[in-house]
Amino acid sequence: MARGQRLALLLMLVMTGLMVSPVTASAATNRVSGTAYYDAAVCPGPPAGYEDFTSYDGFVIEGSLEGCLYTNVLDTRETPSGVYLEMGEEVFVGSLDGGPVGTFATTYRFESKWDPDVSTGVEVHGRCQHPIVRGSGTGGFEGARGRLDFKDIIGDTVTYVYRGHIRLT
C-alpha cells in the first residue's frame, strides 16, 4: 500500500472513531445566562448544611440555570463617597438546562455605587462576580467549575441579569 493510501486510511479511521465516540455533555463548557430576583416564597430556605446562608431572601435564578441561590455575607465595607463592597459565600440549588438537580457553592464579591451614599442614597450601579468553589458540586453539578457574573439593572425595581460559564467534569 502506498504511503498516501495508508495516510488516507488512517485519517478515515480516526474520523470514523470521532464520529461514533460519544461526547458527554458533562465534559462541555456551558455558557449560561438569565435573570434573577429575590423571593422568599419561591426560595424559602437553604439546603441542609447551609443554615447560615440567610443574609438575604432566597434569590430566584431563571434561564440556563433554574433554582435558588442563598447568601452568607462575610464582610462589608462602605465609603463616604457611596461605594459599597460586600464579600461572602453562596450555595445554588437547582439545575442546568433542565438537567438533574444538584448544588454548587460560590464565593462572591459585590461592588456598587450609591448616590449620595449607601445609607441615604439610591443605587447607581452594581455588579458581582461568583467563582464556583472547586469540588463543591453535587448531583447534576458534580465536578462543576466556572463563574457567574451578575449585573444590577437599576429602575423603579432593581432587577438582575447574569451570565457566565460552567464546566462539568
What annotation goes with each model-predicted range?
Residues 10-20:
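Bacterial N-terminal signal peptides
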